[in-house]
């Protein structure tokens, strides 16, 4: 994947995360703050930081629940080297449903 394709895919993914949170977090429990390619989510469990790393073509997640993760894109999913999938992890930790197929 070239840099342009990665940038577009990563941006689409982060915007998708923001849209799903705003759509489903009716009570406004999660405070969403997006600046460029850095997304901060202030939750009851702490602050999540999601950002893109163009050089390594990864999305990085810092979670107050499960710690740091690096995700690479493969076969339609953002996966970590230890087997986590970004959307499944966010669903479990945030209680927001992310339909993986909608991104692509």
Swiss-Prot record:
PANTHER family xref list: FRATAXIN, FRATAXIN, MITOCHONDRIAL
PROSITE patterns the record matches: FRATAXIN_1, FRATAXIN_2
One Pfam family recorded for the sequence: Frataxin_Cyay
Top-level division of the source organism's lineage: Bacteria
Keyword Transcription found: no
GO CC annotation terms, alphabetical: cytoplasm
GO BP, one annotated term: iron-sulfur cluster assembly
Name this polypeptide is given: Iron-sulfur cluster assembly protein CyaY
GO MF annotation, one: ferrous iron binding
